[in-house]
């Protein structure tokens, strides 16, 4: 009997210690709230610099958009995250807005975040959706941090709650949040409050403060090597159907939906050519236009051929553009101060003008290549 009581007491003590330990961990992580999903008040010097949100983009954005009554949204990949500012004056009557683009997402993920937004944000009136070639690659699978369960609801998913409060990664992120908040209290981190990415933090932490040319080289090589980007490519019918679902639902809900192809730098289009995917690139545009008119900012126009120098006014590297260029994109799409936008930047594609436009891009590419053989060779040298 004595041994039984001893075991019972030991078990109770162990449970008590474990419960206290977990409560302390949960309290610690809840206070520092490294992914900014709990809603803990921020205290300067302790927990206000949330740089760790970058490792839980899909989680924190699903929660963040629920904290406002959004009237306008941006959707797409990290190109949209960097380039589009919700405070653009052309959207002044559609505030607040939120940049709900998700890093490296495929079209299915983008569709599901669209579904999430319209399920929880009944006031949304306008959506601007950026489309990228790689988003429609059959090999581009859902990212590991994508979870269906957190979408379509304003409540925090139980699995996410555990991840935020009790997981080892969250504890490490909380420690880093304390360190960053204490050592760099005025640093905004990777994201602004409206969901737009901070290019300065990205250049520092992701590109290790490298100059423009090393950044171009790093990104282009990545696109050429990775099978889910340009390494291999098969246009996904399923992803086209996901886009069509977004278009159809927007029409049914009376939401103004603007579609556009990102204005990456000319070297990004050279990477598509070097990868042997130019015909697939054009086939993708044809498939898009069959679904809806779409603004095309790609190609070799006066903006995408910006001279490569350090610093650059409009580009971070070949794939991602800055707010300065994003403002011109929005000027064109929203017909806001159209006189500020070069005439060759942004063409509304329809079945009527598509083939002429594709032919014009081929001619523009030949002229650009003749004038820039150094950069043609630069991209070709990166092919694995």
Please give the residue ranges for each predicted region:
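Hydrophobic membrane-insertion alpha-helices, especially the h-region
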Residues: 12-33
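Short extracytoplasmic
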Residues: 47-74
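Active-site segments of SGNH/GDSL-like serine hydrolases
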Residues: 249-273
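C-terminal regions of proteins
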Residues: 282-384
């Amino acid at each position: 009997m004595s041994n039984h009581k001893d075991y019972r007491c030991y078990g109770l003590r162990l449970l008590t210690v474990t419960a206290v330990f977990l409560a302390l961990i949960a309290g610690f992580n809840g206070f520092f709230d490294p992914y900014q999903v709990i809603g803990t008040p921020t205290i300067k010097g302790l927990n206000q610099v949330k740089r760790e949100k970058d490792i839980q983009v899909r989680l924190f954005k699903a929660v963040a958009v629920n904290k406002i009554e959004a009237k306008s949204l941006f959707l797409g990949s990290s190109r949209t995250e960097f380039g589009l500012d919700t405070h653009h004056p052309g959207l002044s009557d559609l505030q607040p807005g939120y940049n709900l683009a998700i890093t490296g997402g495929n079209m299915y993920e983008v569709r599901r975040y669209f579904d999430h937004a319209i399920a929880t944000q009944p006031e949304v009136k306008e959506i601007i959706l950026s489309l990228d070639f790689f988003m429609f690659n059959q090999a581009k699978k859902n990212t590991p941090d994508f979870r269906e369960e957190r979408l379509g609801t304003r409540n925090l998913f139980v699995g996410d709650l555990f991840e935020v409060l009790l997981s080892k990664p969250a504890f490490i992120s909380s420690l880093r949040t304390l360190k960053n908040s204490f050592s760099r209290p005025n640093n905004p981190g990777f994201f602004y409050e409206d969901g737009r990415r901070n290019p300065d933090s990205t250049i520092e932490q992701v590109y290790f403060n490298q100059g423009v040319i090393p950044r171009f080289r790093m990104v282009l090589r990545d696109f050429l090597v990775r099978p889910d980007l340009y390494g291999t490519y098969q246009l996904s019918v399923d992803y086209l159907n996901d886009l069509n679902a977004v278009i159809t639902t927007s029409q049914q809900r009376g939401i103004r939906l603007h579609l556009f192809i990102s204005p990456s730098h000319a070297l990004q289009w050279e990477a598509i050519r070097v990868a042997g995917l130019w015909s697939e690139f054009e086939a993708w545009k044809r498939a898009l236009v069959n679904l809806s008119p779409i603004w095309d900012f790609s190609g070799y126009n006066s903006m995408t051929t910006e001279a490569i120098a350090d610093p650059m006014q409009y580009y971070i590297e070949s794939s991602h553009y800055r707010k300065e260029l994003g403002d011109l994109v929005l000027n064109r799409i929203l017909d806001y101060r159209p006189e500020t936008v070069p005439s060759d930047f942004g063409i509304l594609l329809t079945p009527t003008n598509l083939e002429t436009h594709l032919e014009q891009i081929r001619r523009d590419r030949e002229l650009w290549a003749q004038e820039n053989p150094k950069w043609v060779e630069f991209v070709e040298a990166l092919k694995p």
